[in-house]
UniProtKB/Swiss-Prot annotation:
Name under which the protein is recorded: FMN-dependent NADH:quinone oxidoreductase
Subunit structure as annotated in this protein's UniProt entry: Homodimer.
Species the sequence originates in: Yersinia enterocolitica serotype O:8 / biotype 1B (strain NCTC 13174 / 8081)
Family the UniProt entry places it in: Belongs to the azoreductase type 1 family.
Cofactor details (free text): Binds 1 FMN per subunit.
């Protein structure tokens, strides 16, 4: 039995193309893997606090007393990391906003990137500590960006996930959403077809 974590990050709720793909994934996975456990976390509905000068102090080893706000951030960070570690398959709905990922997903990354916890520095360089995971990225875009210099989402996510130890990463694209209903419908259909294959693999 596998455990699956689905992370949504779109601010558009049910109107979101990436959220629709995430919901489709959940349906398909439940059908194909009936005994598996799926956890869905919506980072827009349950926003992660922005990392600032106060909160960053909570994520670094120190003997200093923590403020109530720092205590909350550290507890949330511990919760998110434990959740990430507990799951085998990590699904991220990551729409492109102004050429990059949503703030909601970046805030999540900022709280799980902790030296000595999710990665460590060694004589040979950084080493990720979140290992043995499979990641599936569902990324929707208004334009066509795949394999072009304007796609900052793919290299960034590969870099970050690899940095914390997740190197098995599959991308599913839904592009050209803003080009009109016909293109958007085809993009969703193509993405769902690929997702069906990914789920059954």
């Amino acid at each position: 039995m596998s455990k699956v974590l689905v992370l949504k990050s779109s601010i558009l709720a049910t109107y979101s193309q990436s959220n629709q793909l995430a919901d489709f994934f959940v349906e398909q996975w439940k059908t194909a893997h009936a005994g598996d456990e799926i956890t869905v976390r919506d980072l827009a509905a349950q926003p992660i606090p922005v990392l600032d000068g106060e909160l960053v102090g909570a994520l670094r080893p120190s003997d200093a007393a923590l403020t109530p706000r720092q205590q909350e951030a550290l507890a949330l960070s511990d919760e998110l990391i434990a959740e990430l570690q507990a799951n085998d398959v990590i699904v991220m709905a990551a729409p492109m906003y102004n050429f990059n990922i949503p703030t909601q997903l970046k805030n999540y990354f900022d709280l799980i990137a902790r030296a000595g916890v999710t990665f460590r520095y060694t004589e040979k360089g950084p080493e990720g500590l979140i290992t043995g995971k499979r990641a599936i990225i569902l990324t929707s875009r208004g334009g066509i960006h795949k394999d072009t210099p304007t796609d900052l989402v793919v290299p960034y996510l590969r870099l970050f996930l690899g940095f914390i130890g997740i190197t098995d990463v599959k991308f599913v694209f839904a592009e050209g959403i803003a080009y009109g209903p016909e293109v958007a419908t085809k993009a969703q259909a193509d993405a769902k077809e690929l997702l069906t294959q990914v789920v059954s693999a």
